[in-house]
Structures are given as C-alpha cells and as structure tokens.
C-alpha cells in the first residue's frame, strides 16, 4: 500500500463513513460502502488530482450509497400506508421524543440530495462549504437545495400540525 494512499485512508475514512452512515442508516452497510469507495480510490489514485481527493471520494461514497439504496428499494417494497398511520395526528402536546421520531421520519422521507444535505448541515452541523465539498455541489446549489428541503419539511409539519 502506498504511503500516499494510507494517508488518504487515515484522513478521510471517518468522513466517508459518516456520509455513508447517514445516507444508508445502517452502520455495517455504511462500512461496506466506505470500503468500496476506497477500493475505487485505490484503483484510480493515479488518475485523480491529489488536491481533489476529498471531494472525489465523498462523491464516490455518496453515489455508491445511492446505488445501494436503489437496489434495496428494488428488493423491499416500502409500505407507505403503515408510515402514514403511525405519523397521523397533531404534534401539539407531543413529547420531544415523539417530535424527534416524526422529524427523523420526515428527513428519511426526503429524496436525495435533500436528505443528505439536511443531515450534514442541520443535524451534523457541517458548514455550507464543508457540505458543498463533501457532495461536490456548488455553494449556491447547497443553499438552494437546503431551502427546498426545509420547505418540504415545513409543509409536512403543517399537514400534521395545522
């Protein structure tokens, strides 16, 4: 293993795993996705600009996770009526835990890249610049997509809590 590659693994492994974990919602699957991303890095290390390793790796990790979600969705049918039944009713008087559960479901229900952006920016509290770098989006895209994602969350809240 080259010294340069070993340094990249040490420097970016935790960040890649964090991105994978929040997209996939499964620690073991996130570990597998992270390993796959680093295998791709190993196979392409001579083709990648060393100054762009982090954004390249975060994008490969994200795309690999999205592929896994697509495969998972193809294999398991999602029961929307069950989710809707659990989340019905006003949130007024709901405990913080119930509100947290509702919010987690709402975030999970967002499509990519909205879900990743909300998790990285609002939950993990990364800066806009860090999120842009991780997902290889422009700063303007990050802000626009976050605005849309938050609007969707507000609309969902308004449906549950008039």
Regions found by a protein language model. Give the residues of each.
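A short, charge-rich alpha-helical start-of-domain segment used by transcription regulators
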Residues: 1-18, 28-31, 42
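Residue-level preference for hydrophobic side chains embedded in well-ordered alpha helices
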Residues: 8, 12, 16, 37, ...
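Residues within helix-turn-helix
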Residues: 28, 129, 140
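Structural recognition of an alpha-helix C-terminal capping motif at a helix-to-coil junction
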Residues: 32-39, 43, 51-63
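Arg/Lys-rich amphipathic alpha helix in sigma70-family domain 2
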Residues: 59-79, 96
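Acidic, proline/glycine-rich intrinsically disordered inter-domain spacer in sigma factors
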Residues: 81-108
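A short pre-motif secondary-structure segment
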Residues: 117-121
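DNA-recognition helix of helix-turn-helix
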Residues: 135-159
């Amino acid at each position: 293993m080259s010294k340069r590659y070993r340094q990249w693994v040490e420097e970016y492994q935790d960040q890649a795993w964090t991105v994978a974990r929040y997209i996939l919602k499964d620690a073991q699957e996130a570990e597998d996705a992270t390993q796959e991303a680093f295998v791709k890095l190993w196979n392409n290390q001579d083709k990648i600009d060393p100054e762009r390793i982090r954004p390249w790796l975060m994008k490969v990790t994200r795309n690999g996770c999205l592929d896994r979600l697509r495969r998972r969705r193809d294999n398991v049918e999602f029961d929307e009526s069950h989710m809707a039944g659990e989340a019905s009713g006003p949130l007024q008087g709901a405990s913080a835990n119930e509100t947290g559960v509702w919010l987690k479901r709402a975030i999970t229900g967002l499509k990519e890249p909205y879900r990743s952006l909300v998790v990285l920016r609002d939950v993990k509290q990364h800066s806009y610049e860090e999120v842009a770098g991780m997902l290889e989006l422009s700063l303007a895209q990050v802000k626009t997509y976050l605005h849309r994602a938050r609007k969707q969350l507000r609309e969902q809240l308004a449906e549950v809590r008039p």
